[in-house]
Amino acid sequence: MEQGAKRVRFYIVAADGLSKRDLFRQPDPFAILTVDGEQTHTTKVIKKSVNPYWNEGFEVTVKPSSVISIRLFDQKKFKKKDQGFLGLVSFRMREVGSFRSNREVSLTRPLKKSSTTNLSVLGNLVLKVAPSKIRAPAGNHSSTTANRTTSTPTTTTARTTRTTPRPTATTNTSNQSTSNSTRNGTSAATSNGTGTGAGTGASHRSSPVTNRQTNNTSALSNSNAHIMSSFEDQYGRLPPGWERRADSLGRTYYVDHNTRTTTWTRPASSTNPVHNTSSDSQRLNHQNRHLPDDSNPSLMQSDSGNDLPFGWEMRYTDTGRPYFVDHNTRTTTWVDPRNPLVRPNGGSSTVGSLMQPQSLSHLGPLPSGWEMRLTNSARVYFVDHNTKTTTWDDPRLPSALDQDVPQYKCDFRRKLIYFRSQPGMRPLPGQCNVKVRRDHIFEDSYAEIMRYSAHDLKKRLMIRFDGEDGLDYGGLSREFFFLLSHKMFDPIYCLFEYSAVDNYTLQINPHSSINPEHLNYFRFIGRVIGLAIFHRRFLDAFFVVSLYKKLLRKKVSLADMESIDAEFYRSLKWVLENDITGILDLTFSVEEDHFGEVRTVELITNGENIEVTEENKKKYVDLVTEWRVSKRVEQQFNAFYSGFVELVSPDLVNVFDERELELLIGGISDVDVEDWKSHTEYRTYIATDPVIKWFWEIIAGWKNEDRSKLLQFATGTSRIPVNGFRDLQGSDGPRKFTIEKAGTPDQLPVAHTCFNRLDLPDYPSKDTLHEKLSLAVENTVGFGNE
């Protein structure tokens, strides 16, 4: 027998992967909810998105037999017959689990075709159904929620036993997710995170605000909450170091200031052995998962017998964390000045083997936004809060490079530190999500990048490849720029061309106007280059010198012609160096072949009738050079430049010269095996193990092209920073290339591109290693979950 009618609240949360029917335009989706063909509600319109997020709730009256229908439409085509339909979800209320219970139910349903139209339909719809008396959460919800797994361990409290969400530990120095993706040669997948085995689902880190589950501990009434302090609740006073707080939905959670973690579960008393074990385990996991804080008891000595240096004072924060005030320089630090500081780098340095606080004070305070910290082994590292990165190098030192490093690298590095420390080059809060298909990366990237404002593109860039669930902590974005640069600079698109038959440097194609949208594409490419510089990524491309000079607004010269057309350059140089009287019959005009049609272009007014003489030949050469390098591609370059300066201010980039700008955009393509080897770390392996020796022997015997492929396989990019492998970037700053013993000899090597790590099984012979490594590098494409 059917139950009577009841009120529920339907939430249309989000849709994921909707069909995109226009090449350069995304739909403006909205949803229409209908109950039994009578009750109708409509969501707002989300502009230009195939992954819309609404999270809108509607009160409806339903019965178990009620038919729920949600239809999605493109608002721009809604009034056009059979064109605006994006998908349909339909089901009966009895199909929704726990209809009779008073709890939330989440649904993810694939979108279906309509019986009245034959349009293709893609994607899923995410819904929530909640009793009307329960207020559904309105936290941040990603359009990919349906693919994530929320951890809901069973927790016993003083009064109730139920399944509750437990937020994972977080700190203010790390936002890394434990969701991992691996690049595995066997399954043709590549990793973007850490992990130990393939095939397990990616975990999703929850927090008190974003977790979607309700909690019994949030049942405190407002009348009781205001009469209790934050250090007690209805069960009594909390243990020392604990605090009770409420999120934006009124749900209670607990903060452990001892370990800087949060939990939905009320902490038990210290006499509870189960809680002690759990707390110890959480502390251990917290220490293993994050960089240690400088408040490590082993490093913070409060013994009054060990006096502070003159002018120093130790104080405490509200949470009891000690910090130190240097009244000499009017600065504060977490680092105890009584502890000797280990030098920042592991190699030789002019700083000395140990840096005492007195020697550091001579360098002056750290730049704005920088902080010095210590690892467990008391090794100093530096945090740049402006760019949210870490480094071993002291930013106050002129250079931490070795003494034999060329001067140009030292100069470039100083400029780079200055360039990246400027406010205009600091990432903005939030994320910029870009989802593309590998086989349509050019078209998808154009649509995604051009729909964002320059402000949004300066947020943290998160790349996602369609059908691959890897989280982007650096490896995916490096792979993205590598693949995209191969596509958008391909001469087949007529946007760029090679400068000469024997030279693979690129220049703007003067005949790009064959594509009526070419100026929009040049603005897009300018944005991509600016985006790569802003987010510290490399493009796998090199341009003619004149293009770098024009980006810096420098005047081009005859010497720049050599990289464009060496034969034409030699001809013009001969004209300047020799008497042309009676030898050459030239006028102030040039001929241009435009798809088989020869056109005459006058360099000056009536130039076709003005003869070039010994007196005016210098002017002729200058005009020809300017036309060949600049004038004939002026429109294209202006569009290209307009996109570039949206991300990178011309006043900032002018600190570099044209050669340094080339390194900033493309890095170094030649792979130095000795430099690679000297800046590699090993886990479980040691440098003298046979497999490691075979590995470097194989790499040394490869061509540079094959080495670049391996580098791209393991790190996501084939380019190297100008300072070599010592400056290789990971997910959170500089991270060395690492080889770890993992897997069995019948498996292929596995790459973790976010962490520059290669999992290498202990192969029995050099031939086996060579075969497996080559197979993995040549045939692995894509990402999967660990």
Curated annotation (Swiss-Prot):
**Alphabetic keyword roster:** Repeat, Transferase, Ubl conjugation pathway
What name appears for this protein in its UniProt entry? E3 ubiquitin-protein ligase pub3
Give the domain of life. Answer: Eukaryota
Upper classification of the source organism reads: Eukaryota, Fungi, Dikarya, Ascomycota, Taphrinomycotina
Boundaries of each C2 domain copy? Answer: 1-109
Q: Where is this region: Disordered?
A: 134-225, 263-306
Q: Is the keyword Repeat in the record? A: yes
GO MF term set: phospholipid binding; ubiquitin protein ligase activity
Q: Which residues form the active site?
A: 754 (glycyl thioester intermediate)
List, as start-end ranges, the regions of compositional bias called Low complexity.
142-193, 214-225
Name its GO BP terms in alphabetical order: intracellular transport; protein ubiquitination; ubiquitin-dependent protein catabolic process
Which ranges carry the HECT domain?
A: 453-786
Repeat recorded as keyword: yes
Q: Which InterPro entries match?
A: C2_dom, C2_domain_sf, E3_ub_ligase_SMURF1, E3_ubiq-protein_ligase, HECT_dom, Hect_E3_ubiquitin_ligase, WW_dom, WW_dom_sf
Composition skew (Polar residues), residue ranges: 204-213, 263-285, 295-305
Question: In the Enzyme Commission scheme, what number(s) does this protein have?
Answer: 2.3.2.26
